[in-house]
């Protein structure tokens, strides 16, 4: 379609044209009659939120490209493919090469798309650097398919070998002095806090994305009723008391915090009293793949948990679509045909026993499954900087 016919078609796109305010219709008619460039006209309209879809004025109705095909063409262009390579990619779709070439020409001259390509270029370089970090990590003698399990070292050694290196580790003996380890059980909570109102998540199994809907799944229940429900459940992900319930359960946590203490000597900031988070539920409770915005300790008090971890530098393969979550909830059960990038990840799996504590470094992806009825406590108040979440970028697409 030549410039003259493009101009005429721009006026003849009735639904769009008639939706313009009268002054903009007059402006459009005047500029087209004066022979102004259609693409420049479009950019001005676009800047005022008045522009139609690109292909609605480049092509007639029977020539328009589907939204799916447009997205495919944009993806190929962002990958750096030349027009000839893109045409080869889609030759089986029986679409006129002329339409494709015109569309790509318009897109590549668009100032917004140019900025998008610049950002994509930066992201590609960041991804390359993460890949290099992962490859170099494989040269480390400590880099294996298993996670170290050691007696809790002094705090300086922990910082040097694990915290600062972003290496997960299972620590033994660090909470042997906690009364919680020797007292807490479902029966203990039911007997000593039977009339305590606690907030939990319920009906999780009704939603595939239950973790993203955690706010609407919150319910208030008596502790004795909560314990009765989970004891009557052999295996379920339907009811769970988690860290997401911490704000409402603050008073309850204050009551039981006397059963907790410093981890090993010097690990925690003792003056901070509100950085313990309770996890309590039946066998089968599951927290899907995500990463945390702080370094975390997960202390197992009752029952066992299986934790699957994936290194932070493998984020480019993790289909991170929303906040800290992945489109994939469980990497072990993932459909690799649907999510082929997951073939590049190296999961680490461990089973956490009562009395053991897992250090989960910031940015490390992990999912957690309760193998038994389970009580855990996580905490973040390390005696070093762990205040990174305030600089975390907001999602631009919600």
Predicted regions and their residues:
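Fe(II)/2-oxoglutarate
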Residues: 1-16, 21-22, 28, 34, ...
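N-terminal accessory scaffold of Fe(II)-dependent oxygenases
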Residues: 98-357, 365-398
